[in-house]
């Protein structure tokens, strides 16, 4: 009743709401995906957030990560990955593994996986009808899978490749916004 009697206030509230919605829609939303969401995808999430912040673009991007499996749901980031991030001054303490959902497909502009196995499993969760799925290193000059350091134990190579992929992905996105 109050809103109808004070149309000026009602109009102001609606205008603020519409402005907030537009700001959200302008934001580029990226979801990084790997098998368990404890190594590669959270590493990509936090390296990309750091890259975006250093570019002064943190208000223009929303970034998360998820898993294709249920195996690690609720667990924190794997300790060697946490050390990599901590050594860079990046806080990841509150990150917990979660599984990709069908709703993620509608909520994110880019859904970026680490390898072909992830890509196949993402399509089992929800088919890529809008062309949102890519492997991270597909944006580089040398497209290939990011090896899983859980098995390879080569965290340095994984870190280097993910950093290269994030830089290439950001360049791709910014070029396509123009």
Regions found by a protein language model. Give the residues of each.
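Conserved active-site segments centered on acidic
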Residues: 25-107, 171-178
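Compositionally biased, intrinsically disordered low-complexity segments enriched
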Residues: 6, 17-19, 82, 178
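Phosphate-binding/catalytic loops
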Residues: 110, 116-178
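Feature targets compositionally biased, intrinsically disordered low-complexity regions
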Residues: 7-10, 19, 130, 164
């Amino acid at each position: 009743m109050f809103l109808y009697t004070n149309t000026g206030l009602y109009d102001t509230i609606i205008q603020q709401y519409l402005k907030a919605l537009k700001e959200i829609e302008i934001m580029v939303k990226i979801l990084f995906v790997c098998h368990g969401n404890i190594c590669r995808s959270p590493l990509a999430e936090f390296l990309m957030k750091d890259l975006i912040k250093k570019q002064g673009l943190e208000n223009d991007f929303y970034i998360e990560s998820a898993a294709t499996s249920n195996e690690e749901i609720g667990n924190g980031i794997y300790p060697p990955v946490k050390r990599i991030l901590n050594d860079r001054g990046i806080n990841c303490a509150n990150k917990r593994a979660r599984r990709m959902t069908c709703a993620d497909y509608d909520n994110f502009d880019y859904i970026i996986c680490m390898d072909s196995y992830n890509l196949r499993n993402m399509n089992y969760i929800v088919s890529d009808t809008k062309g949102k799925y890519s492997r991270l290193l597909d944006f580089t000059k040398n497209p290939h899978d990011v090896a899983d350091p859980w098995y390879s134990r080569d965290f340095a190579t994984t870190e280097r490749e993910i950093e290269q992929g994030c830089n290439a992905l950001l360049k791709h996105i910014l070029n396509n916004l123009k």
